[in-house]
Amino acid sequence: MRSKHLVTLFIITFLSFSTVKVWGKDVFAGFVTKKLKTLLDCNFALYYNFKGNGPDAGSFLDFVDEPEQFYWFVEHFLSVKFRVPKHLKDKNIHNFTPCLNRSWVSEFLKEYEEPFVNPVMKFLDKEQRLFFTYNFGDVEPQGKYTYFPVKEFHKYCILPPLIKTNIKDGESGEFLKYQLNKEEYKVFLSSVGSQMTAIKNLYSTVEDEQRKQLLKVIIENESTNDISVQCPTYNIKLHYTKECANSNNILKCIDEFLRKTCEKKTESKHPSADLCEHLQFLFESLKNPYLDNFKKFMTNSDFTLIKPQSVWNVPIFDIYKPKNYLDSVQNLDTECFKKLNSKNLIFLSFHDDIPNNPYYNVELQEIVKLSTYTYSIFDKLYNFFFVFKKSGAPISPVSVKELSHNITDFSFKEDNSEIQCQNVRKSLDLEVDVETMKGIAAEKLCKIIEKFILTKDDASKPEKSDIHRGFRILCILISTHVEAYNIVRQLLNMESMISLTRYTSLYIHKFFKSVTLLKGNFLYKNNKAIRYSRACSKASLHVPSVLYRRNIYIPETFLSLYLGLSNLVSSNPSSPFFEYAIIEFLVTYYNKGSEKFVLYFISIISVLYINEYYYEQLSCFYPKEFELIKSRMIHPNIVDRILKGIDNLMKSTRYDKMRTMYLDFESSDIFSREKVFTALYNFDSFIKTNEQLKKKNLEEISEIPVQLETSNDGIGYRKQDVLYETDKPQTMDEASYEETVDEDAHHVNEKQHSAHFLDAIAEKDILEEKTKDQDLEIELYKYMGPLKEQSKSTSAASTSDELSGSEGPSTESTSTGNQGEDKTTDNTYKEMEELEEAEGTSNLKKGLEFYKSSLKLDQLDKEKPKKKKSKRKKKRDSSSDRILLEESKTFTSENEL
């Protein structure tokens, strides 16, 4: 017995010692050294030798001061399965055999649940520096740079220009070109007149006979050939995060960098320090007022030099992938990490201030979890479900004894009292067709994503998710709202039967699922926005699961706003067991450790709120319609009792773990009636605003760079330059900016390039809709269950003349079954033209405002309606009436369940 105790004591001591060893100052050293050091060295060797010309010292990545470079290395090397590129297989660089088909991040996360990223950064930085020292000796490592290309000070070249021609050299066959040196450029600048006059003046001063002969050939062929003077590009190189962390504006950051660099008397080692010499030379050649302005710039931080030459677009920067460095056409410097987008031009000027635009604000890499970069679906699921598995033992099914003990009132819920309409705000507009509502719902969600991704406050982000609390609630709530709107219009005979096969939630799912659908607006290639859009895509799928009994083509579920929920949990809202039925349904998903638990819970609560919302709106403001479908909705007082019962159950000891798990991922706003209804009212206001905006064209900022209007052609100093520097009221960039801020500004006649969320589908796509619908049904099988043949054939027959929403952010046109094909086509294109005139593109796309994230449902800004939408009512066709009547006879009504 003593020996067993001694063995136990020895094991505990050994384990404690091992833990101290691993979790010391270098928290990952113990584990990584033993198991992953080899794989890490393989990745470093592959990265530094990627070009195949031996290790490159310019490839060093600063993991600590430039977190974006750390995540880049994780994304492109550590998180993918290790493979040797073809161009390196025959080179004896490193022994890669032990590392093949292994992912460093995947293996690392299997040992560490979800470590803090900062210690990982520091550890990998230390390992990289050891690798760098081993290969390059005493060379000082420098992290990669962010490039800011600049060519001109107004229209003066910063560097000596290049004279390009289309005159062919008789010997080489290449076009003649002439690169000016500094002395020649000084003569060029002193010339007065046209560019050819300056070239002729230069010819008279050149002493080198060979260069002089080249200029002579150019001058002699000026009348028959194309001759131009082009400015070379100078790349301002910055360690972006490190040098811009204290500045809230990209352009001001570059200004501050130039001040610090140029005011140093000794020669700076920074690669962009020579820009000061180029500017000093240029300003001395041009003389006043430029030289005086440069001195003011050096001493006064309010004096700015770097200005935008074009209205900036997203993405702000082009970040390169490893394969881009192998492209001989791009010819990238190894030390270049990212470069200012080619559409986002900058130039130098002492005139005016930097325009007020959020795109000029500094973008810094946020700290994200390593699990974001896991390679395979298996890795992602492993890390996600691991969180759920730690929640404890599963909840056992409720017993009859417990039910009889906890339920004191076994009577059925009944309430026929009238609604107090003085406390109800009118919000619902029944005249908007469902097809329009679908597109507007997607657009509203895009605007919500804008607000969330632009927030700088991470306080509302749950610890175990990258999505802000409340976002999934808004996504599901809006989907449920418009889904129920479809049912209400069906019951009131205001909508075409064909809309039953085009559910809003599925439209939203398809809209946000594919990132390629979002090209042309702010969401495309925005990592944060992509995460939110995919989360909304997944969440919206659970709405039809609750509203339509998980099988989306069962006609009986369209007969009320709660029948699908009743069938889902096998109980009726009036039953005293209804709350327990909902909780027990959710317990099954909680015990599985499934994300579906959270999404089903939000969807079920949303459906209950939606019943209350439509009951109040129809009862108070649409009394005739209300009498027709009164029995198809749950009375608000009953809804309140159900919601209160669910909330109390979730707070009980038995189900408290479920509530805790939910709050780890989502907001408690779902339990607040006031906040939920505020979100619904805000969406209704947005619908009215959007309908009004659809009637006019909104001017869109062109992506074409703005050309500066100045009489200065880059030749010499003249009086007009002084006027340009001192008297010009505003730059073209500011003029464009102010014009876009004024929403009532006059419209321009040129073709606009607005990126609409409601784009019409091309005619060629119409023929493919049937196939796409079938593909979608197969894809959604695991969520919705099998399809009924009768309803499937009905929906297939009724969709032959309809525009589908299966691809892209489009709205669908509906046409009655008794219209001819020509008339249907005319109506289709008429609606397409109306949609093309719609406004409502993202304000972030225009770069006019800086949105703060709305972290709670009641904090979302309300959209102000501007005009009333013209009333239009669609009648259901007679054939659809017969179909619905026949199908309704084959199913029991909701009152019999």
Swiss-Prot record:
The chain crosses the membrane at residues 597-615. One of its GO terms (cellular component) is symbiont-containing vacuole membrane. Disulfide bonds join 157-231, 244-253, 262-276, 421-620, 475-536. Its main location: host cell. Residues 1-24 form the signal peptide. Residues 792-801 have a biased composition (Polar residues). Residues 802-817 have a biased composition (Low complexity). Residues 865-876 have a biased composition (Basic residues). Pfam families: RhopH3_C (PF22808). Proteolytically cleaved near C-terminus. Keywords: Cytoplasmic vesicle, Disulfide bond, Host cell membrane, Host membrane, Membrane, Phosphoprotein, Signal, Transmembrane, Transmembrane helix, Transport. It is a single-pass membrane protein; Peripheral membrane protein. The modification Phosphoserine is found at residue 804. It is found in: Host cell membrane; Parasitophorous vacuole membrane; Cytoplasmic vesicle, Secretory vesicle, Rhoptry. Component of the RhopH complex, composed of CLAG3.1/CLAG3.2, RhopH2 and RhopH3 with a 1:1:1 subunit stoichiometry. Interacts with CLAG3.1/CLAG3.2. Interacts with CDPK1; the interaction promotes RhopH3 phosphorylation in merozoites. This is High molecular weight rhoptry protein 3. The gene is RhopH3.
